[in-house]
From Swiss-Prot:
Subcellular localization(s) per the UniProt record: Cytoplasm; Cell membrane; Mitochondrion
Keyword entries, A-Z: Cell membrane, Cilium biogenesis/degradation, Cytoplasm, Developmental protein, LIM domain, Membrane, Metal-binding, Mitochondrion, Repeat, Zinc
Gene that specifies this protein: prickle3-a
Organism: Xenopus laevis (African clawed frog)
Disulfide links within the chain: none
Residue ranges with Basic and acidic residues bias: 435-449
Residue stretches of biased makeup (Low complexity): 475-488, 514-523
GO molecular function terms listed in the Swiss-Prot or TrEMBL record: zinc ion binding
Domain (LIM zinc-binding) ranges: 177-241, 242-302, 305-366
GO biological process: cell projection organization; establishment of planar polarity
GO cellular component: mitochondrion; plasma membrane protein complex
Membrane topology designation: Peripheral membrane protein
Protein name (database record): Prickle planar cell polarity protein 3-A
Recorded family membership: Belongs to the prickle / espinas / testin family.
Amino acid sequence: RRRRSQGSEVNLTGQGQPCHSCGERCPGFLAHRWRKICQHCQCPWEEHGHTASNQDLERSLCRLVSGSQRDSLCESSSDSSVEKYAWVPSGLNPVQVHQFFKCFPEKKIPFINSPGEKYRLKQLLHQLPPHDSEARYCCSLQGEEEEELLLLFSQKRRLENLGRGCVRPVSGTMSGTVCQQCGHQISVGDVAVFASRAGLGFCWHPQCFTCAQCLELLCDLIYFYQDGKVYCGRHHAELKRPRCLACDEVIFSLECTEAEGFHWHTRHFCCFECECPLGGQRYIMKDQRPFCCSCYERLYAQYCDSCGECIGIDEGQLTYGGQHWHASESCFRCGRCGVCLLGRPFLPRHGQIYCSRSCSVLNATPESSFSPSQTDLSFQKETKDVGTSTNHELDGDSINDCTLSGSRRSLSIIDQTPISRAAPIRSLHSSLRGAPKEFSRECPNRRSLPDLNSHTRTPTRVTFQLPLSSEVKESVSLSHPSFTSSSSSDEEEGYFLGEPIPLPPFLRPPGYSAPPTHAPTSTTKKKKKKKDKSCLLS
Protein backbone atom coordinates (compact mmCIF):
# COMPACT_ATOMS: atom_id res chain seq x y z
CA ARG A 1 0.00 0.00 0.00
CA ARG A 2 2.83 2.34 0.72
CA ARG A 3 4.28 1.67 -2.72
CA ARG A 4 0.91 2.48 -4.25
CA SER A 5 0.88 5.92 -2.63
CA GLN A 6 4.32 6.58 -4.09
CA GLY A 7 3.35 5.32 -7.55
CA SER A 8 3.26 7.02 -10.90
CA GLU A 9 -0.51 7.58 -10.99
CA VAL A 10 -0.17 11.03 -9.46
CA ASN A 11 -0.58 12.74 -12.82
CA LEU A 12 -4.22 13.03 -13.86
CA THR A 13 -3.56 15.19 -16.90
CA GLY A 14 -1.08 12.90 -18.65
CA GLN A 15 2.42 13.58 -19.85
CA GLY A 16 2.77 16.14 -22.61
CA GLN A 17 -0.57 17.89 -22.16
CA PRO A 18 -0.40 21.59 -23.20
CA CYS A 19 -0.50 24.41 -20.67
CA HIS A 20 -3.53 26.70 -20.81
CA SER A 21 -1.55 29.61 -19.32
CA CYS A 22 1.76 29.39 -21.18
CA GLY A 23 0.49 28.08 -24.49
CA GLU A 24 3.27 27.21 -26.93
CA ARG A 25 5.98 28.35 -24.53
CA CYS A 26 5.53 25.10 -22.57
CA PRO A 27 6.42 21.92 -24.53
CA GLY A 28 3.97 19.89 -22.45
CA PHE A 29 3.31 18.69 -18.94
CA LEU A 30 6.25 17.03 -17.21
CA ALA A 31 5.35 16.03 -13.66
CA HIS A 32 7.65 16.90 -10.80
CA ARG A 33 8.66 14.09 -8.48
CA TRP A 34 6.48 15.31 -5.61
CA ARG A 35 5.28 18.82 -6.44
CA LYS A 36 1.98 19.20 -8.28
CA ILE A 37 3.57 21.40 -10.93
CA CYS A 38 5.06 21.13 -14.40
CA GLN A 39 8.85 21.03 -14.49
CA HIS A 40 8.90 22.99 -17.74
CA CYS A 41 6.72 26.01 -16.97
CA GLN A 42 6.25 25.52 -13.20
CA CYS A 43 2.49 26.04 -13.55
CA PRO A 44 0.11 24.02 -11.33
CA TRP A 45 -1.05 20.73 -12.77
CA GLU A 46 -4.63 21.94 -13.15
CA GLU A 47 -3.38 24.41 -15.78
CA HIS A 48 -2.57 21.40 -17.98
CA GLY A 49 -6.03 19.85 -17.81
CA HIS A 50 -7.41 18.44 -21.05
CA THR A 51 -10.62 16.78 -22.19
CA ALA A 52 -8.72 13.52 -22.60
CA SER A 53 -8.60 13.21 -18.79
CA ASN A 54 -12.32 13.82 -18.26
CA GLN A 55 -13.09 10.13 -17.73
CA ASP A 56 -10.47 9.70 -15.01
CA LEU A 57 -11.50 12.95 -13.39
CA GLU A 58 -15.22 12.19 -13.41
CA ARG A 59 -14.59 8.67 -12.11
CA SER A 60 -12.72 10.14 -9.15
CA LEU A 61 -15.45 12.71 -8.52
CA CYS A 62 -18.17 10.06 -8.73
CA ARG A 63 -16.40 8.14 -5.99
CA LEU A 64 -16.22 11.38 -4.04
CA VAL A 65 -20.01 11.80 -4.14
CA SER A 66 -20.61 8.05 -3.57
CA GLY A 67 -21.91 7.56 -7.11
CA SER A 68 -25.37 8.86 -6.23
CA GLN A 69 -25.27 11.67 -8.80
CA ARG A 70 -23.06 10.23 -11.49
CA ASP A 71 -25.52 11.15 -14.21
CA SER A 72 -25.37 14.85 -13.44
CA LEU A 73 -21.65 14.96 -14.04
CA CYS A 74 -21.91 13.81 -17.61
CA GLU A 75 -25.59 14.23 -18.25
CA SER A 76 -26.69 14.07 -21.87
CA SER A 77 -29.92 15.06 -23.51
CA SER A 78 -31.56 14.55 -26.86
CA ASP A 79 -32.34 18.25 -27.10
CA SER A 80 -29.79 20.04 -29.28
CA SER A 81 -29.92 23.15 -27.09
CA VAL A 82 -28.66 21.12 -24.12
CA GLU A 83 -26.14 18.95 -25.95
CA LYS A 84 -23.94 21.98 -26.60
CA TYR A 85 -23.01 22.13 -22.88
CA ALA A 86 -20.33 19.92 -21.32
CA TRP A 87 -22.38 19.82 -18.10
CA VAL A 88 -25.90 20.85 -17.10
CA PRO A 89 -27.74 20.73 -13.75
CA SER A 90 -30.13 17.83 -13.39
CA GLY A 91 -33.90 18.21 -13.49
CA LEU A 92 -34.09 21.27 -15.75
CA ASN A 93 -35.71 21.69 -19.13
CA PRO A 94 -33.83 23.46 -21.97
CA VAL A 95 -35.44 26.83 -21.18
CA GLN A 96 -34.42 26.62 -17.53
CA VAL A 97 -30.91 25.47 -18.48
CA HIS A 98 -30.54 28.56 -20.66
CA GLN A 99 -31.90 30.72 -17.83
CA PHE A 100 -29.38 29.17 -15.42
CA PHE A 101 -26.28 29.71 -17.58
CA LYS A 102 -27.40 33.21 -18.57
CA CYS A 103 -26.38 34.30 -15.05
CA PHE A 104 -22.70 33.45 -15.67
CA PRO A 105 -20.01 35.31 -17.64
CA GLU A 106 -19.63 33.87 -21.12
CA LYS A 107 -16.07 32.69 -20.46
CA LYS A 108 -17.37 30.50 -17.59
CA ILE A 109 -20.25 28.83 -19.45
CA PRO A 110 -19.18 25.21 -20.21
CA PHE A 111 -19.89 25.11 -23.93
CA ILE A 112 -18.23 22.11 -25.57
CA ASN A 113 -14.76 22.94 -26.95
CA SER A 114 -14.83 26.45 -25.48
CA PRO A 115 -12.83 28.38 -22.86
CA GLY A 116 -15.71 27.71 -20.48
CA GLU A 117 -15.12 23.96 -20.71
CA LYS A 118 -11.42 24.44 -19.94
CA TYR A 119 -12.37 26.65 -17.01
CA ARG A 120 -14.70 23.94 -15.66
CA LEU A 121 -12.01 21.25 -15.87
CA LYS A 122 -9.45 23.50 -14.21
CA GLN A 123 -11.86 24.35 -11.39
CA LEU A 124 -12.75 20.68 -10.85
CA LEU A 125 -9.08 19.83 -10.34
CA HIS A 126 -8.50 22.86 -8.13
CA GLN A 127 -11.64 22.82 -5.98
CA LEU A 128 -11.83 19.03 -5.60
CA PRO A 129 -8.21 17.80 -5.45
CA PRO A 130 -8.22 14.02 -5.95
CA HIS A 131 -5.35 13.70 -3.47
CA ASP A 132 -7.69 14.98 -0.75
CA SER A 133 -9.83 11.85 -1.00
CA GLU A 134 -7.81 9.03 -2.58
CA ALA A 135 -4.41 7.76 -1.50
CA ARG A 136 -3.40 6.68 -5.00
CA TYR A 137 -3.08 10.33 -6.02
CA CYS A 138 -0.79 11.14 -3.07
CA CYS A 139 3.00 11.01 -3.03
CA SER A 140 3.74 12.31 0.48
CA LEU A 141 1.96 9.79 2.72
CA GLN A 142 4.37 7.99 5.03
CA GLY A 143 3.18 4.50 5.88
CA GLU A 144 -0.20 2.83 6.24
CA GLU A 145 -1.10 4.92 9.27
CA GLU A 146 -1.25 8.14 7.27
CA GLU A 147 -3.17 6.41 4.49
CA GLU A 148 -5.80 5.34 7.02
CA LEU A 149 -5.98 8.87 8.38
CA LEU A 150 -6.64 10.15 4.87
CA LEU A 151 -9.40 7.57 4.37
CA LEU A 152 -11.10 8.52 7.64
CA PHE A 153 -10.70 12.21 6.84
CA SER A 154 -12.36 11.79 3.45
CA GLN A 155 -15.22 9.64 4.76
CA LYS A 156 -16.05 12.06 7.57
CA ARG A 157 -16.20 15.04 5.23
CA ARG A 158 -18.38 13.09 2.82
CA LEU A 159 -20.87 12.14 5.54
CA GLU A 160 -21.01 15.44 7.43
CA ASN A 161 -20.28 18.23 4.97
CA LEU A 162 -20.49 17.19 1.32
CA GLY A 163 -23.50 18.15 -0.76
CA ARG A 164 -24.63 19.13 -4.22
CA GLY A 165 -26.80 22.10 -5.04
CA CYS A 166 -30.21 21.62 -6.60
CA VAL A 167 -31.45 24.12 -9.19
CA ARG A 168 -35.14 24.86 -9.54
CA PRO A 169 -37.38 27.89 -10.15
CA VAL A 170 -38.67 29.88 -7.20
CA SER A 171 -42.39 29.15 -6.84
CA GLY A 172 -45.12 31.56 -5.82
CA THR A 173 -45.35 30.01 -2.35
CA MET A 174 -41.70 31.02 -1.76
CA SER A 175 -42.18 34.73 -2.43
CA GLY A 176 -39.78 36.92 -0.51
CA THR A 177 -36.90 34.45 -0.82
CA VAL A 178 -33.56 36.17 -0.16
CA CYS A 179 -30.15 35.14 -1.52
CA GLN A 180 -27.81 34.02 1.27
CA GLN A 181 -24.81 35.64 -0.43
CA CYS A 182 -25.88 39.08 -1.68
CA GLY A 183 -29.01 39.56 0.46
CA HIS A 184 -31.17 40.57 -2.51
CA GLN A 185 -34.57 39.09 -3.15
CA ILE A 186 -34.97 36.34 -5.76
CA SER A 187 -37.98 36.97 -7.96
CA VAL A 188 -40.67 34.36 -8.46
CA GLY A 189 -39.97 32.29 -11.56
CA ASP A 190 -36.21 32.84 -11.50
CA VAL A 191 -34.00 29.80 -11.01
CA ALA A 192 -32.11 29.51 -7.72
CA VAL A 193 -29.64 27.07 -6.16
CA PHE A 194 -30.82 25.23 -3.04
CA ALA A 195 -28.44 23.47 -0.63
CA SER A 196 -30.01 20.76 1.51
CA ARG A 197 -27.18 20.92 4.08
CA ALA A 198 -28.05 24.56 4.79
CA GLY A 199 -31.72 23.79 5.51
CA LEU A 200 -35.08 24.46 3.93
CA GLY A 201 -35.58 27.86 2.35
CA PHE A 202 -31.87 28.65 2.02
CA CYS A 203 -30.99 29.46 -1.57
CA TRP A 204 -28.62 31.50 -3.72
CA HIS A 205 -28.58 33.22 -7.07
CA PRO A 206 -26.71 30.96 -9.55
CA GLN A 207 -23.91 33.51 -9.80
CA CYS A 208 -23.79 33.89 -5.99
CA PHE A 209 -23.29 30.20 -5.19
CA THR A 210 -19.56 30.61 -4.54
CA CYS A 211 -16.94 29.42 -2.06
CA ALA A 212 -16.83 31.56 1.08
CA GLN A 213 -13.01 31.54 0.95
CA CYS A 214 -11.97 32.00 -2.70
CA LEU A 215 -15.29 33.45 -3.95
CA GLU A 216 -15.12 31.27 -7.09
CA LEU A 217 -18.19 29.58 -8.53
CA LEU A 218 -18.70 26.15 -6.99
CA CYS A 219 -18.01 23.89 -9.93
CA ASP A 220 -20.82 21.46 -10.79
CA LEU A 221 -22.61 22.81 -7.68
CA ILE A 222 -20.52 20.55 -5.38
CA TYR A 223 -20.11 22.20 -1.98
CA PHE A 224 -19.02 21.50 1.59
CA TYR A 225 -21.14 23.09 4.29
CA GLN A 226 -19.50 24.30 7.49
CA ASP A 227 -20.78 26.74 10.16
CA GLY A 228 -23.41 28.35 7.94
CA LYS A 229 -21.14 28.79 4.91
CA VAL A 230 -20.49 26.84 1.75
CA TYR A 231 -16.92 26.05 0.66
CA CYS A 232 -15.19 24.30 -2.18
CA GLY A 233 -13.50 21.02 -1.31
CA ARG A 234 -10.00 22.52 -1.20
CA HIS A 235 -10.69 25.29 1.27
CA HIS A 236 -12.98 23.18 3.42
CA ALA A 237 -10.18 20.63 3.85
CA GLU A 238 -7.85 23.44 4.93
CA LEU A 239 -10.31 24.29 7.71
CA LYS A 240 -9.70 20.82 9.13
CA ARG A 241 -6.04 20.15 8.35
CA PRO A 242 -3.02 22.19 7.17
CA ARG A 243 -2.00 21.84 3.55
CA CYS A 244 1.60 21.60 2.37
CA LEU A 245 2.43 24.58 0.17
CA ALA A 246 4.96 22.53 -1.79
CA CYS A 247 3.21 19.23 -2.61
CA ASP A 248 -0.37 20.57 -2.21
CA GLU A 249 -1.39 17.61 -0.04
CA VAL A 250 -3.08 17.62 3.34
CA ILE A 251 -0.57 17.07 6.15
CA PHE A 252 -1.27 14.07 8.40
CA SER A 253 2.17 13.77 9.98
CA LEU A 254 2.73 14.74 13.61
CA GLU A 255 5.25 17.44 12.72
CA CYS A 256 5.22 20.14 10.09
CA THR A 257 6.93 23.44 9.38
CA GLU A 258 5.02 26.71 9.60
CA ALA A 259 6.38 29.99 8.23
CA GLU A 260 4.99 33.11 6.56
CA GLY A 261 1.47 31.91 7.39
CA PHE A 262 1.91 28.70 5.35
CA HIS A 263 2.61 25.08 6.19
CA TRP A 264 4.99 22.48 4.76
CA HIS A 265 5.91 18.88 5.34
CA THR A 266 9.20 19.15 7.19
CA ARG A 267 11.10 17.47 4.35
CA HIS A 268 9.38 19.71 1.76
CA PHE A 269 10.49 22.99 3.32
CA CYS A 270 13.35 23.45 0.87
CA CYS A 271 14.59 25.85 -1.79
CA PHE A 272 12.30 25.90 -4.79
CA GLU A 273 15.30 26.03 -7.14
CA CYS A 274 17.99 23.73 -5.73
CA GLU A 275 15.79 21.86 -3.17
CA CYS A 276 18.33 22.25 -0.39
CA PRO A 277 16.71 22.02 3.10
CA LEU A 278 15.85 25.37 4.65
CA GLY A 279 15.12 24.23 8.19
CA GLY A 280 17.05 26.58 10.49
CA GLN A 281 18.47 28.42 7.46
CA ARG A 282 17.88 31.84 6.01
CA TYR A 283 15.44 31.99 3.11
CA ILE A 284 13.51 34.48 1.01
CA MET A 285 9.87 34.09 -0.07
CA LYS A 286 8.99 35.10 -3.62
CA ASP A 287 5.56 34.36 -5.10
CA GLN A 288 4.85 32.04 -2.16
CA ARG A 289 7.96 30.00 -2.95
CA PRO A 290 10.98 29.84 -0.60
CA PHE A 291 14.48 30.33 -2.00
CA CYS A 292 17.87 30.01 -0.39
CA CYS A 293 19.98 33.16 -0.42
CA SER A 294 22.39 32.03 -3.13
CA CYS A 295 19.63 30.98 -5.55
CA TYR A 296 17.69 34.17 -4.93
CA GLU A 297 20.71 36.35 -5.69
CA ARG A 298 21.49 34.31 -8.79
CA LEU A 299 17.94 34.55 -10.14
CA TYR A 300 16.45 37.81 -8.90
CA ALA A 301 19.18 40.15 -7.62
CA GLN A 302 19.22 43.65 -9.14
CA TYR A 303 22.22 45.58 -10.42
CA CYS A 304 23.21 49.05 -9.29
CA ASP A 305 22.79 51.67 -12.03
CA SER A 306 25.72 53.60 -10.62
CA CYS A 307 28.51 51.07 -10.05
CA GLY A 308 27.09 48.16 -12.06
CA GLU A 309 27.63 45.67 -9.24
CA CYS A 310 25.07 43.19 -7.94
CA ILE A 311 23.02 44.44 -4.99
CA GLY A 312 23.19 41.77 -2.31
CA ILE A 313 20.21 40.78 -0.21
CA ASP A 314 21.86 42.30 2.87
CA GLU A 315 22.69 45.60 1.21
CA GLY A 316 20.39 48.57 1.28
CA GLN A 317 18.68 49.20 -2.03
CA LEU A 318 16.94 52.23 -3.50
CA THR A 319 14.58 51.86 -6.44
CA TYR A 320 12.89 54.48 -8.59
CA GLY A 321 11.34 54.26 -12.05
CA GLY A 322 12.82 50.82 -12.75
CA GLN A 323 16.33 51.87 -11.69
CA HIS A 324 18.22 50.53 -8.70
CA TRP A 325 21.07 51.86 -6.58
CA HIS A 326 23.05 50.81 -3.56
CA ALA A 327 21.83 52.83 -0.58
CA SER A 328 25.31 54.27 -0.11
CA GLU A 329 26.93 57.67 -0.51
CA SER A 330 29.19 56.41 -3.29
CA CYS A 331 26.32 55.18 -5.51
CA PHE A 332 23.24 57.28 -4.81
CA ARG A 333 24.71 60.66 -5.67
CA CYS A 334 24.38 63.51 -8.15
CA GLY A 335 25.55 62.59 -11.64
CA ARG A 336 27.18 66.02 -12.06
CA CYS A 337 28.70 67.25 -8.82
CA GLY A 338 28.76 63.92 -6.94
CA VAL A 339 26.95 65.15 -3.82
CA CYS A 340 25.22 62.39 -1.84
CA LEU A 341 21.44 62.35 -2.34
CA LEU A 342 20.43 60.04 0.51
CA GLY A 343 17.56 61.74 2.32
CA ARG A 344 17.62 64.68 -0.08
CA PRO A 345 15.47 65.74 -3.05
CA PHE A 346 16.76 64.64 -6.42
CA LEU A 347 15.93 65.16 -10.07
CA PRO A 348 15.84 62.12 -12.43
CA ARG A 349 16.77 63.07 -15.97
CA HIS A 350 17.88 60.88 -18.92
CA GLY A 351 18.82 57.88 -16.77
CA GLN A 352 20.83 59.96 -14.28
CA ILE A 353 19.93 61.66 -11.00
CA TYR A 354 20.91 65.20 -10.05
CA CYS A 355 20.77 67.37 -6.98
CA SER A 356 19.36 70.41 -8.79
CA ARG A 357 18.21 71.69 -12.15
CA SER A 358 21.44 73.56 -12.65
CA CYS A 359 23.42 70.32 -12.50
CA SER A 360 21.08 68.62 -14.93
CA VAL A 361 21.41 71.53 -17.39
CA LEU A 362 25.20 71.63 -17.15
CA ASN A 363 25.40 67.88 -17.73
CA ALA A 364 22.84 67.86 -20.58
CA THR A 365 23.81 66.24 -23.86
CA PRO A 366 24.09 68.36 -27.03
CA GLU A 367 20.88 66.83 -28.34
CA SER A 368 18.94 68.16 -25.38
CA SER A 369 20.45 71.69 -25.39
CA PHE A 370 18.53 74.72 -26.58
CA SER A 371 18.47 75.61 -30.25
CA PRO A 372 16.44 78.04 -32.38
CA SER A 373 14.28 75.20 -33.71
CA GLN A 374 13.63 73.25 -30.51
CA THR A 375 12.96 74.05 -26.89
CA ASP A 376 13.11 71.69 -23.93
CA LEU A 377 9.65 72.13 -22.45
CA SER A 378 10.61 70.32 -19.29
CA PHE A 379 12.56 73.40 -18.21
CA GLN A 380 9.49 75.59 -18.61
CA LYS A 381 7.48 73.79 -15.95
CA GLU A 382 6.74 75.69 -12.82
CA THR A 383 8.20 73.81 -9.88
CA LYS A 384 7.69 74.19 -6.19
CA ASP A 385 10.37 75.01 -3.70
CA VAL A 386 11.47 71.65 -2.32
CA GLY A 387 13.56 71.34 0.80
CA THR A 388 15.21 68.45 2.57
CA SER A 389 12.93 65.42 2.77
CA THR A 390 11.30 64.52 6.04
CA ASN A 391 9.10 61.67 7.22
CA HIS A 392 5.86 63.61 6.90
CA GLU A 393 3.88 63.68 3.64
CA LEU A 394 4.32 66.66 1.35
CA ASP A 395 1.92 68.09 -1.21
CA GLY A 396 2.17 67.88 -4.96
CA ASP A 397 3.51 65.40 -7.47
CA SER A 398 7.10 66.37 -6.73
CA ILE A 399 7.31 63.83 -3.93
CA ASN A 400 7.85 60.16 -4.79
CA ASP A 401 8.66 57.20 -2.61
CA CYS A 402 12.03 55.56 -3.10
CA THR A 403 12.27 52.08 -1.65
CA LEU A 404 15.02 51.26 0.81
CA SER A 405 15.62 47.62 1.66
CA GLY A 406 14.24 47.04 5.13
CA SER A 407 12.37 50.33 5.40
CA ARG A 408 10.59 52.96 3.32
CA ARG A 409 12.37 56.27 2.83
CA SER A 410 10.51 59.29 1.49
CA LEU A 411 12.60 61.34 -0.91
CA SER A 412 11.77 64.56 -2.70
CA ILE A 413 11.93 64.39 -6.47
CA ILE A 414 12.36 67.73 -8.27
CA ASP A 415 10.03 66.82 -11.10
CA GLN A 416 6.41 67.30 -12.00
CA THR A 417 5.94 64.01 -13.87
CA PRO A 418 3.76 61.57 -11.86
CA ILE A 419 5.66 58.37 -11.14
CA SER A 420 4.13 55.14 -9.83
CA ARG A 421 5.25 53.99 -6.42
CA ALA A 422 7.79 51.20 -6.37
CA ALA A 423 7.07 47.99 -4.49
CA PRO A 424 8.95 47.41 -1.22
CA ILE A 425 11.78 44.90 -1.21
CA ARG A 426 12.08 42.30 1.50
CA SER A 427 15.08 42.61 3.82
CA LEU A 428 16.86 40.12 6.03
CA HIS A 429 18.56 40.90 9.33
CA SER A 430 21.49 38.49 9.17
CA SER A 431 24.57 39.05 7.04
CA LEU A 432 25.70 37.23 3.94
CA ARG A 433 29.28 37.67 2.74
CA GLY A 434 30.13 37.54 -0.92
CA ALA A 435 28.19 36.55 -4.02
CA PRO A 436 28.01 33.08 -5.60
CA LYS A 437 30.88 32.34 -7.96
CA GLU A 438 28.66 30.69 -10.54
CA PHE A 439 26.81 33.93 -11.15
CA SER A 440 26.77 34.54 -14.90
CA ARG A 441 24.10 37.17 -15.35
CA GLU A 442 25.03 40.02 -17.68
CA CYS A 443 25.05 43.58 -16.49
CA PRO A 444 22.05 45.57 -17.77
CA ASN A 445 22.53 48.50 -20.12
CA ARG A 446 23.20 51.68 -18.20
CA ARG A 447 23.83 55.25 -19.14
CA SER A 448 27.33 56.28 -18.10
CA LEU A 449 28.41 59.82 -17.34
CA PRO A 450 30.38 61.51 -20.15
CA ASP A 451 34.03 62.38 -19.66
CA LEU A 452 33.71 66.04 -18.85
CA ASN A 453 37.48 66.62 -18.82
CA SER A 454 37.75 65.92 -22.56
CA HIS A 455 35.20 68.57 -23.49
CA THR A 456 35.53 72.33 -23.21
CA ARG A 457 32.37 74.02 -22.12
CA THR A 458 31.39 77.34 -23.62
CA PRO A 459 28.78 79.71 -22.28
CA THR A 460 25.29 78.83 -23.38
CA ARG A 461 24.31 80.89 -26.36
CA VAL A 462 20.69 81.50 -27.21
CA THR A 463 19.95 82.90 -30.63
CA PHE A 464 16.70 84.28 -31.90
CA GLN A 465 15.52 84.37 -35.49
CA LEU A 466 12.80 86.72 -36.65
CA PRO A 467 10.17 85.15 -38.90
CA LEU A 468 9.89 85.96 -42.58
CA SER A 469 7.38 88.56 -43.70
CA SER A 470 4.95 85.90 -44.89
CA GLU A 471 5.02 84.25 -41.45
CA VAL A 472 4.45 87.38 -39.37
CA LYS A 473 1.16 87.03 -37.50
CA GLU A 474 1.53 89.84 -34.99
CA SER A 475 2.83 93.37 -35.15
CA VAL A 476 6.43 93.95 -34.17
CA SER A 477 7.41 97.16 -32.41
CA LEU A 478 10.98 98.37 -32.43
CA SER A 479 12.39 100.89 -30.01
CA HIS A 480 15.09 103.31 -31.09
CA PRO A 481 17.07 105.85 -29.10
CA SER A 482 15.50 109.29 -29.26
CA PHE A 483 17.31 112.23 -30.75
CA THR A 484 16.53 115.76 -31.95
CA SER A 485 17.77 117.68 -34.94
CA SER A 486 17.46 121.37 -35.58
CA SER A 487 17.12 120.77 -39.32
CA SER A 488 14.22 118.26 -38.96
CA SER A 489 12.39 119.37 -35.82
CA ASP A 490 9.53 120.85 -37.81
CA GLU A 491 9.31 118.04 -40.40
CA GLU A 492 6.47 115.51 -40.59
CA GLU A 493 6.85 112.11 -38.97
CA GLY A 494 8.43 109.54 -41.34
CA TYR A 495 10.58 112.03 -43.17
CA PHE A 496 14.19 112.95 -42.76
CA LEU A 497 15.76 115.94 -44.47
CA GLY A 498 12.68 116.21 -46.64
CA GLU A 499 12.78 112.61 -47.89
CA PRO A 500 10.55 109.62 -46.76
CA ILE A 501 12.27 107.03 -44.62
CA PRO A 502 11.96 103.54 -46.26
CA LEU A 503 10.73 100.65 -44.11
CA PRO A 504 13.19 97.91 -43.13
CA PRO A 505 12.88 94.72 -45.26
CA PHE A 506 11.38 92.58 -42.47
CA LEU A 507 8.58 95.17 -41.87
CA ARG A 508 7.56 95.61 -45.48
CA PRO A 509 4.10 94.18 -46.28
CA PRO A 510 3.57 92.10 -49.44
CA GLY A 511 3.54 94.25 -52.58
CA TYR A 512 5.42 97.05 -50.91
CA SER A 513 7.22 99.46 -53.24
CA ALA A 514 9.73 102.01 -52.07
CA PRO A 515 8.53 105.65 -52.26
CA PRO A 516 10.01 107.73 -55.07
CA THR A 517 13.01 109.71 -54.09
CA HIS A 518 14.34 112.85 -55.71
CA ALA A 519 17.78 112.92 -57.22
CA PRO A 520 20.12 114.04 -54.54
CA THR A 521 22.13 117.21 -54.99
CA SER A 522 25.89 117.26 -55.05
CA THR A 523 25.89 118.71 -51.56
CA THR A 524 23.81 115.81 -50.29
CA LYS A 525 26.13 113.27 -51.93
CA LYS A 526 29.13 114.83 -50.31
CA LYS A 527 27.48 114.77 -46.92
CA LYS A 528 26.42 111.12 -47.37
CA LYS A 529 29.91 110.09 -48.43
CA LYS A 530 31.37 111.92 -45.51
CA LYS A 531 28.91 110.18 -43.20
CA ASP A 532 29.67 106.76 -44.66
CA LYS A 533 33.32 107.13 -43.81
CA SER A 534 32.62 107.56 -40.12
CA CYS A 535 29.60 105.20 -39.73
CA LEU A 536 29.86 101.47 -39.18
CA LEU A 537 26.93 99.11 -39.63
CA SER A 538 26.82 96.09 -37.39
